[in-house]
Amino acid sequence: MAAVVEVEVGGGAAGERELDEVDMSDLSPEEQWRVEHARMHAKHRGHEAMHAEMVLILIATLVVAQLLLVQWKQRHPRSYNMVTLFQMWVVPLYFTVKLHWWRFLVIWILFSAVTAFVTFRATRKPLVQTTPRLVYKWFLLIYKISYATGIVGYMAVMFTLFGLNLLFKIKPEDAMDFGISLLFYGLYYGVLERDFAEMCADYMASTIGFYSESGMPTKHLSDSVCAVCGQQIFVDVSEEGIIENTYRLSCNHVFHEFCIRGWCIVGKKQTCPYCKEKVDLKRMFSNPWERPHVMYGQLLDWLRYLVAWQPVIIGVVQGINYILGLE
């Protein structure tokens, strides 16, 4: 059994020299961590006032950044959403390459390739008739996969906290890493696909002409036409469809199942695509497991801020500290 290293840090430069002379090659990973921890404390001894300034700078920057982001989102939501989506897409790529997370990189490349193709199809004019259904099916699939992955990851974390991993002879750190990884995958791709779907939904719906962001639709909606994809509806609301059913909203407008699910759940729309009347989701989705969960949506919004803007804010704080000579 390896001996336990007791690290005593002396004062000033002498203490730092003692720590620098420790041979790290013969130590266990835990002992190496203790030595590194002691070195950090020795390096920053006597910097309490400087650290207090750095904390104040961090808090002030977070408050100012939050106010600026809120104002930007309220005044120019379109540019805010586009910049946030771009950062959500590329910021993790930097950390993935830097930290050699190759599994995440492979999944990111596959998701980006298919999503780029789907987004390209959604932004073409004239819009191909099969494109809206392709877009909503793809993003609805990713939504379900990410939701299920997040649930499994959350359950793995909770089981680890309650010690149930010991029943399967799994180490707590391995079980926790597995749960947190799945939870992050589910939440990250859940945020990304919802933002892409919202952008595609607005673009396609305005191109088809039954929906406009402001003002009246440019086309009149027939009773047998879906306002999301513009295609004919062949299955009656009261009939059971072979591939998909037909849904009727509280405003009496009817839609394909995949289209309205993609519009409301994935595209984050809470109004009718044609008349903009508020959608009663509880009435439309009678099964409680199908209802979009409010807390899940709020959690995705929080993760969007964390991934897209937190690295930028931390970078600004580090730049201020560097200019002021704080460390």
From Swiss-Prot:
GO terms for molecular function: ubiquitin protein ligase activity; zinc ion binding. It is a multi-pass membrane protein. InterPro entries: RNF121/RNF175 (IPR040176), Znf_RING (IPR001841), Znf_RING/FYVE/PHD (IPR013083). It catalyses: S-ubiquitinyl-[E2 ubiquitin-conjugating enzyme]-L-cysteine + [acceptor protein]-L-lysine = [E2 ubiquitin-conjugating enzyme]-L-cysteine + N(6)-ubiquitinyl-[acceptor protein]-L-lysine. It is an enzyme of class 2 (transferase). Its EC number is 2.3.2.27. The chain crosses the membrane at residues 50-70, 79-99, 100-120, 148-168, 172-192, 306-326. A zinc finger (RING-type) spans 226-276. The modification N-acetylalanine is found at residue 2. Keywords: Acetylation, Endoplasmic reticulum, Membrane, Metal-binding, Transferase, Transmembrane, Transmembrane helix, Zinc, Zinc-finger. It is found in: Endoplasmic reticulum membrane. Pathway: Protein modification; protein ubiquitination. GO terms for biological process: ERAD pathway; protein ubiquitination. Belongs to the RNF121 family. E3 ubiquitin ligase which accepts ubiquitin and transfers it to substrates thereby promoting their degradation by the endoplasmic reticulum-associated degradation (ERAD) pathway which is a pathway involved in ubiquitin-dependent degradation of misfolded endoplasmic reticulum proteins. May regulate the unfolded protein response to reduce endoplasmic reticulum stress. This is E3 ubiquitin ligase RNF121. It comes from Homo sapiens.
